[in-house]
């Protein structure tokens, strides 16, 4: 989940 806030890592 690299969308912005949850997949920021």
Swiss-Prot record:
Main location as per UniProt: secreted
Coiled coil: none
Gene Ontology biological-process annotations: neuropeptide signaling pathway
Positions where Arginine amide occurs in the chain: 9
Localisation per UniProt entry: Secreted
One GO cellular component term: extracellular region
Protein origin, superkingdom: Eukaryota
Keywords associated with the record: Amidation, Neuropeptide, Secreted
Segment forming the signal sequence: none
UniProt function note: Myoactive peptide. Increases the amplitude and frequency of spontaneous contractions and tonus of hindgut muscle.
UniProt protein name: Tachykinin-related peptide 2
């Amino acid at each position: 989940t690299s969308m912005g806030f949850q997949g920021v890592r």
